[in-house]
Amino acid sequence: MGVNDLWQILEPVKQHIPLRNLGGKTIAVDLSLWVCEAQTVKKMMGSVMKPHLRNLFFRISYLTQMDVKLVFVMEGEPPKLKADVISKRNQSRYGSSGKSWSQKTGRSHFKSVLRECLHMLECLGIPWVQAAGEAEAMCAYLNAGGHVDGCLTNDGDTFLYGAQTVYRNFTMNTKDPHVDCYTMSSIKSKLGLDRDALVGLAILLGCDYLPKGVPGVGKEQALKLIQILKGQSLLQRFNRWNETSCNSSPQLLVTKKLAHCSVCSHPGSPKDHERNGCRLCKSDKYCEPHDYEYCCPCEWHRTEHDRQLSEVENNIKKKACCCEGFPFHEVIQEFLLNKDKLVKVIRYQRPDLLLFQRFTLEKMEWPNHYACEKLLVLLTHYDMIERKLGSRNSNQLQPIRIVKTRIRNGVHCFEIEWEKPEHYAMEDKQHGEFALLTIEEESLFEAAYPEIVAVYQKQKLEIKGKKQKRIKPKENNLPEPDEVMSFQSHMTLKPTCEIFHKQNSKLNSGISPDPTLPQESISASLNSLLLPKNTPCLNAQEQFMSSLRPLAIQQIKAVSKSLISESSQPNTSSHNISVIADLHLSTIDWEGTSFSNSPAIQRNTFSHDLKSEVESELSAIPDGFENIPEQLSCESERYTANIKKVLDEDSDGISPEEHLLSGITDLCLQDLPLKERIFTKLSYPQDNLQPDVNLKTLSILSVKESCIANSGSDCTSHLSKDLPGIPLQNESRDSKILKGDQLLQEDYKVNTSVPYSVSNTVVKTCNVRPPNTALDHSRKVDMQTTRKILMKKSVCLDRHSSDEQSAPVFGKAKYTTQRMKHSSQKHNSSHFKESGHNKLSSPKIHIKETEQCVRSYETAENEESCFPDSTKSSLSSLQCHKKENNSGTCLDSPLPLRQRLKLRFQST
């Protein structure tokens, strides 16, 4: 069909167009093309009645839902030039007949098939037009006149009739529904072919009216001829060939070929160009090289090129002139002269439901309910288009509601329930529950029925609001895990309680202040968990931190459980024979009233007492945070009141800072034995008191000396167990990052390891503050604190290095202090309540003793400044300090501190 090899020539301009892109366009369809395609499908033959009608209906329904308007073209009387082609087609389809082919030029059978299709188009309301001759000629006429946007046909003759856009290879598969598009503008711009050239190709290559064309001429020679003409009309060249004799050809002047340079391809030799230059290259010497495709502009090359082109044209001319009737003016007139006219205006009508039921039942044997179901989509689409354009009447379908939203082929749609239209047939089984449902595009339905869409959107919002109200609030108001992690990352909790083992402590986690939480809960919770009632031994920083942040109950329970498990394990290593020998137990009157508790039972009773206390505290802790702030704030106020009593008695003539520090000093020095307090009075002057110095450091040093004197071998026995738990701290004096509070916490734990001595364990509250603030506020004092702490560690090293069983290693000394602290926790806990009551009975005496100790310790600090290394200086200064103050040994006594204080109060 059409021009031979035309689609192969037009292949470079083919475009792949999805059917969705045809939406909104009007397409002229060659009806005979679709009928022939349906008849060639072998699977439909015999299994489907009237396959051409079924194929036509479903294609129309598919394209109509895509908003593609169709105009079908009916074949007219074929021209006589096509009689030979029609006869051969009929013979191939229906077999040979006895009549002559020249007498049978009509399409009686094919026209009867087309009439059935036209009857269906009338039932569907689709317009169709009658062509005068060929259907493709009418399609081209409609396209050229602007009545349609393109022509849907596989016949290439459409371009020869004047069509501008042709759609070919209509495909309706689910994966890729598309058509191939060819436009006349792209053919002319890319291939250089216009309508005259295409008609000339039809004559040379062959078409329906001239099946053989010019024998011996193929598409390559024909295209080369068109290129030789350079835009000249091919049909005019045919007429010129006909006017002149076919055997005559213009004689070209023969010129002699000159020698050409191998470098520039110009006449002359390379040596000549090297000496004299090239005239065509416009050079005095040498010449310019050119590529292989360069054509020399000399006279011989021009004549040679013309000769070659003329040979191609002469060859085609000879073959064309040999054909009888060339240049076939009848064929040229068939393509160029228009015979078609538009008789009636193209109009679309509403599908007729009753007429369609009758037609499909008669021709296709469709049941009425099936025909109504298939036609409903076309009815709703037509009514929506009319309402969108502003035309409304009572016959239009009315939607009941929007069932739900759908997505079809990537397009947002609504599932619509419609009212039953007139003459709509239903299946017998559907009378009970019947609903007319279709899926329509959201944009089109909203434009046609905006009020229905508004109601649906309102109902959707109401349902969404009800669902949100039904959501119950979470019963558990605990923060989310992400919030807890963010909360803990800004927290700095520094527990310095003496009874907590550093390695197993669960309180060394950072806590940041939160303004929304009560500030008294942490302080009170820790005090209620760790301290017995009426314990006066508080850290100095409790007076500065009036309130702390709440601590998670889970952390408190975890810490308490670890303490119970740790305290329940017996520590047999503390009963060392060397330690007992150094205590001089033979000189003690065991029958007297000097000891309130038996030393033999002290270690065993501690673990049970501590375990019972911790378990009682854990049982009192609720699961939430409702009652904790009030309970804990009461405990904090009780301890703060005891501290204020000490400060109020000696506040005359002293600044608030000095007054506060002096009260702290009393709390720190009251833990020292009587020997150490008298020892510090006699060894240091009274006029070097500096309140800014860490007063806890002096008490730590003094108690440590007592600890070392009584537990030398006991410390050595624990060197090989807990060393990994304590990190070494070898920082120099210039370190500004090491915090004094942390060093005090680590060193002060050592001081409680005095066996069989009644000394209160000082429980320090948590220093809760931001890390940067804590570092900035304590930089000035941290330098002095760091040096003193390191010096005190050296004292412990000096004492233990003298033992035969211990090695002079600083790490072992630190390990020893850890075990000393751990062993002292067990037998000192039972004296919390008893010793705490008597300590605050004489605040004035303790304050005076503290002032003397501070002045004395400042002198020792000045002596240590001459040593560059902190460890060596602390060792030497302590040894000199011991030698010069042997006078205080006369006050040595084996009695515990509590009994000595008791005797002193009686004497005064």
UniProtKB/Swiss-Prot annotation:
Q: Which residues form the signal peptide?
A: none
Q: State the InterPro entries in the record.
A: 5-3_exonuclease_C_sf (IPR036279), GEN_chromo (IPR041012), HhH2 (IPR008918), PIN-like_dom_sf (IPR029060), XPG-I_dom (IPR006086), XPG/Rad2 (IPR006084), XPG_DNA_repair_N (IPR006085)
Q: Cellular component GO terms, alphabetically?
A: centrosome; nucleoplasm
Location of this chain's protein in the cell? Nucleus
Q: Does the keyword Repeat apply?
A: no
Which keywords, in A-to-Z order, does the entry hold?
A: DNA damage, DNA repair, Endonuclease, Hydrolase, Magnesium, Metal-binding, Nuclease, Nucleus, Phosphoprotein
Q: Give the Phosphoserine positions (modified residues).
A: 801-802
**Consequence when changing residue 93 to E:** No effect on endonuclease activity on Hollyday junctions. Slightly reduces endonuclease activity on 5' flap substrates
For this UniProt entry, what is the primary localization, expressed as one broad class?
nucleus
In the record, the effect of residue 438 to E is given as: No effect on endonuclease activity on both Hollyday junctions and 5' flap substrates
UniProt binding sites for Mg(2+) 1: 30, 75, 134, 136
Q: What cofactors does the UniProt entry give for this protein?
A: Mg(2+)
Q: Which GO terms describe its biological process?
A: double-strand break repair via homologous recombination; positive regulation of mitotic cell cycle spindle assembly checkpoint; regulation of centrosome duplication; replication fork processing; resolution of DNA recombination intermediates; resolution of mitotic recombination intermediates
Effect of substituting residue 36 to E: Abolishes endonuclease activity on both Hollyday junctions and 5' flap substrates
Q: GO terms for molecular function, please?
A: 5'-flap endonuclease activity; crossover junction DNA endonuclease activity; four-way junction DNA binding; magnesium ion binding; protein homodimerization activity
Region: Chromodomain; residue ranges are 390-464
Concerning Pfam families, the annotation shows: Chromo_2, XPG_I, XPG_N
Q: How is the cofactor bound?
A: Binds 2 magnesium ions per subunit. They probably participate in the reaction catalyzed by the enzyme. May bind an additional third magnesium ion after substrate binding.
Q: Which domain of life is it from?
A: Eukaryota
Which stretches of sequence are listed as region 5'-3' exonuclease domain? Answer: 208-384
Function of the molecule: Endonuclease which resolves Holliday junctions (HJs) by the introduction of symmetrically related cuts across the junction point, to produce nicked duplex products in which the nicks can be readily ligated. Four-way DNA intermediates, also known as Holliday junctions, are formed during homologous recombination and DNA repair, and their resolution is necessary for proper chromosome segregation. Cleaves HJs by a nick and counter-nick mechanism involving dual coordinated incisions that lead to the formation of ligatable nicked duplex products.
Query: What family is it from?
Result: Belongs to the XPG/RAD2 endonuclease family. GEN subfamily.
Q: What is known of its domains?
A: XPG-N, XPG-I,5'-3' exonuclease domains interact with DNA. Contains a chromodomain that acts as additional DNA interaction site and is required for efficient DNA recognition and cleavage.
PANTHER family of this UniProt entry? FLAP ENDONUCLEASE FAMILY MEMBER, FLAP ENDONUCLEASE GEN HOMOLOG 1
Protein known as: Flap endonuclease GEN homolog 1
